[in-house]
Amino acid sequence: MLKEALEVVTAKRDLDYGQVKNLLDSILEGELDEMKFGAFLAALKTKGETKEEISAFVDAFYEKAQKIEYTHPKTIDTCGTGGDGKGTFNISTASAIVLSCFDLKVAKHGNRSITSNSGSADILENLGIDIQAPPQRILEGLEKHNFAFLFAPKYHPATKKVATVRKSLGIRTVFNILGPLLNPVSLNYQVVGAFDFEAQEKIASVLKGKRKRAAIIHSLDGLDEISVSQKTRVLELQGDNIKEYYIDPKEYGIEYTLDDIKGYTPQENAKIFRSILNGEVSAYYWAVVLNSAFALYIAEVANDIEEGIALCQSAIKKGDAMLKLKDLQQHYKVGA
């Protein structure tokens, strides 16, 4: 089956959903020919993955995932693809904690660092949050504190089977866009940062019609976040509609360089995050406020980004955001 699929994609022909899904099901249930599968992933990338092919990957791995059975009308995730190569501070992770100050249930899907100095799991660990909390504590955390961190390897054991192939290839493949599409919690709202414009469009095509409202973002200076230095392209999804527009940070009086939001070690990033929650105004502060504000708009908490900025600044100024972090540290205490 893998040999036939490899021949098709090498000839630059598309596979349909069923062909890819059946292939992946057989691979995940049986033996994996790593060399052939690596060649298949590389050929698929060269050809360009279609919506149907990506959807088959999502469904095959989601079926094998350990799910968190939690239903709420205001579930949201801010997980991006990562891999933009810019080495910035953990903006989406910090934003996720700010968002949990509001009437939202933030199911933050994430992993350790792959290309940056510090991944979402790394910074949260340094903030004293148990990234491998048991499911019951996750459910209680969502219900009582509006936040849970879902450590990807814990919920997606099937990905271990292909980890060696991915590592040996050393190139971006379809797997680089799967992370945000595989949250173990059912989501109604989502903001997804993409590592390039092509990935942005592919993710939008796959997510279309699957969330109440979502946005896929990529900035002109290459970030999988809303940038504080350049315009960010947004593909906003509502129902079957995709709306394209740009966010200019200058419109909100925000103007910094990429160097101003550089990320460091997990320990240093945790320190920066505490300074943000203490209200110390900096490029980091504005990056987190702007990204949080946009997520509030997407999640229908704020009517627009401007209102979202005011809400986020107020949550930080009043101390709600710092109090939220302390509550999360207590609830998700390691060994508790």
UniProtKB/Swiss-Prot annotation:
GO MF assignments: anthranilate phosphoribosyltransferase activity; magnesium ion binding
First-level EC class: transferase
Pathway(s) served: Amino-acid biosynthesis; L-tryptophan biosynthesis; L-tryptophan from chorismate: step 2/5
Catalytic activity: N-(5-phospho-beta-D-ribosyl)anthranilate + diphosphate = 5-phospho-alpha-D-ribose 1-diphosphate + anthranilate
Keywords: Amino-acid biosynthesis, Aromatic amino acid biosynthesis, Glycosyltransferase, Magnesium, Metal-binding, Transferase, Tryptophan biosynthesis
BP terms from Gene Ontology: L-tryptophan biosynthetic process
Chain sites annotated for binding anthranilate 1: 80, 111
Known EC number: 2.4.2.18
Domain of life: Bacteria
Residues bound to Mg(2+) 2: 224-225
NCBIfam families: trpD
Similarity comment text for this entry: Belongs to the anthranilate phosphoribosyltransferase family.
Quaternary structure annotation from Swiss-Prot or TrEMBL: Homodimer.
Name of the protein: Anthranilate phosphoribosyltransferase
Organism: Caldicellulosiruptor saccharolyticus (strain ATCC 43494 / DSM 8903 / Tp8T 6331)
Lineage: Bacteria, Bacillati, Bacillota, Bacillota incertae sedis, Caldicellulosiruptorales
